[in-house]
């Protein structure tokens, strides 16, 4: 009977020590939950970056393979035109009176858009 008490006491002490390590020791449950949250956050960040990389890779492939993408980018970002094309810039007429004077002035004809052709050889 005495041996059972010692065995029970040793098992209780062992259980208490294991519980202490589980809740408060290194690698405890709080740290594990915090690390799992960090992993989830990093996984979301990685997925966004993976999608961005795929889009950039598709753009690089398109620029390497097709002239249409290069031409479109040259036209929109650099303002380039093909030989023999005529570029038209539409400039709207600016009002001659300041805004306060416009309210007091009689209504004028609506401003007409003018087109200035620019020829490039």
From Swiss-Prot:
Question: Segment Disordered: which positions?
Answer: 98-121
Which segments does the topology annotation call Periplasmic?
Answer: 25-121
Q: Does the UniProt entry include the keyword Coiled coil?
A: yes
Instruction: Tell me the keywords, alphabetical order.
Output: Cell cycle, Cell division, Cell inner membrane, Cell membrane, Coiled coil, Membrane, Transmembrane, Transmembrane helix
Show the Pfam families listed in the entry.
DivIC
User: A single GO BP annotation from the record?
Assistant: FtsZ-dependent cytokinesis
What are the transmembrane regions?
A: 7-24
Segments on the Cytoplasmic side according to the record's topology features: 1-6
Query: According to Swiss-Prot or TrEMBL, what is its membrane topology?
Result: Single-pass type II membrane protein
Record has Ligase as a keyword: no
Q: What does this protein do?
A: Essential cell division protein. May link together the upstream cell division proteins, which are predominantly cytoplasmic, with the downstream cell division proteins, which are predominantly periplasmic.
NCBIfam families per the record? PRK00888.1
UniProt name for this protein? Cell division protein FtsB
- The organism is Xanthomonas campestris pv. campestris (strain ATCC 33913 / DSM 3586 / NCPPB 528 / LMG 568 / P 25)
This chain is encoded by the gene named: ftsB
